Amino acid sequence: MKVSYKLDLSELPRITRKMQDELYRELKQNVQQAAQGVSVQAKQSAPRDKRVGHGGDLHRSIYYRVKDLTGEVGVGMPYGPYQDFGTGNKVVVPPGWEKYAMQFKGAGIRNVNMTPQPFFYPAVNVHETKFNNECEKSISKVMTKRR
């Protein structure tokens, strides 16, 4: 009695190329959704000038762009971080943002203590978790698909 095992790997390059292409498309879509999601939520949460009824320059300066598997979301106005974290003794330092937010804390030349109006970092935090979960799902989906 005996058993033989033989592997035919002739189809392996085609299958791995196909998997790579599928995974690339899935992950690119995840990057697009995450970047757009952060941008939309940040715009919705950005402080608004109640006198004019819209977000003004800060709101309009929030952008996102995606190239391949890289997404970038930003705030184009230099005062954006001051709005997000506050200034002086009113700075709020959220977990995970210590290195960046601490630059706005402390006594400066002027006694300007601006209360934070978080809009950007909460959006990043929400969508970062979603992004990680969606990437895991995409990888699992592509890897378990029958070929």
Language-model features, listed with the residues they occupy:
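Short, Lys/Arg-rich flexible segments
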Residues: 1-80, 92-147
